[in-house]
Structures are given as C-alpha cells and as structure tokens.
Amino acid sequence: MSGSFVIYLIIGIVFLIIIMSAMQGKPKQKSNGCPKHDKVPLINIRVTPNYKTVSMKAMKCDVSDLHTKDYYVVIDTLTVGGDYSENEIIELAFIKVRRTTGEIVDSFTSYVKPYRLEKLRHEQGCLDDAPYAKDVSERLKAAFEDAIVMGYDVKSDIGSVIAMGYIVKVLLDIRFVDLYDELVKDNHETLNKNVQTMAKRYGYVKKSDNQLLDNCYACEYLYRECNFLPL
C-alpha cells in the first residue's frame, strides 16, 4: 500500500468524523405546534400601495393541534376590493379564548383606515377616524403571539390579515385552524359556509350586535358544541 494512498485514506476518515460530529451537535428545531407538512403557502398576494407581489405563508393546523397552545383567537374580517389578493380590511373583530376553560380573556372590534380612501367614499364616514392598519396589525400580533388562530372558512381572512401586516411592516406569524374544513372532513353532506347558519343548528343565540364579533362568538360556540378537543 503506497504512502500517498494511506494519507488520502486518513484524510477521508478525519473528514467523515468531522461531518458526523457536526450533524450530532446540530440543535433540533422546536415544534411550533403544527405539523410541517401542513404548511400552506398563501401566495401571489398583491399588496397596496405599490401592488408588489410577494410570497407569504401561514401554518395551517389540524384542530387537534390546539392543545399545544393555552389560547386560541377566533377572527373575522370585512374587506373591500375583491379576493384577498387585492383587497383591504376595513373592519375586523376577534375574541381570545383560554382553551381549557372557554373563558374569553380579550375581545376586539375596530374599523381600519384603508390606504385607498378614494375608492371607499361610499363607505361609512367612520373610516376616516378609524385606527391605521399598523396599529391594528400590532394589536393582532400581540394577540396571536401565544395562540392559534381559528375561523370558519377563514383562508381569505388569513390572507387579508397577512397582507395588511406586510403593508405596514408588521410581519405576523400565524398558525390557524379552519373550522369549516374540520367539519367537512367527517361530513358527507354539503355544509353551509355561513357560520351563523351552522351555529344555529346547534342552538347558538346571538351575543353581539356587531356582526363580525357575533360571527366570532358563533364560531367559538360551534367549535365547543362539536367536541373537537377534550378540555
């Protein structure tokens, strides 16, 4: 066996040992409570004011993943301008719920001052005095920080919220459950996409005069009545 071959062999063994040591020492990533394969990209979101096309993502979870967080936030939005790829939120509501007890620890309703006011003159005058999108986005970021977001047929709402945050440079880390999708999984009939209609099937009674906030209450009621997750 030649000397040069031995040298190359030793170098190869040392190199292999270094690689294996590096792999063993690599820290494992912490789970955020949602399976990686369920990451759903919300892509091609055209955001105002410059209509830049960006790729943004939210993590879609199963309802069973709710146990990984102490809270969940039920959200609903009112938008103008078409689908979530080019719309703007003009009103928003959410309730934050302690998962183990069902206690509502926070609730929020607000109009949102839009960027394209010239297109919204037909809307209520209260938009002129509404909080800016940045202020509302900061409020959402704080609410979402230790919670999973929930809604009924909620994908477009999630897309609109992410786009709003992007506009004002408030990047939102959203993990969400779509209650409509969860109901469809085990149901052979066509389900109504109106959360009020579905909740009333289970005996829901109106709790708020604000339609968006009442939709949040209806969604939360539906979740508990359907017994998706033991408390």
Where would I find each of the regions flagged by the language model?
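Active-site metal-coordination segments of metallo-dependent hydrolases
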Residues: 188, 207-214
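The feature marks non-catalytic terminal segments
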Residues: 224-231
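Conserved non-catalytic scaffold segment of RNase H-like nuclease domains
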Residues: 51-55, 59-166, 170, 196-204
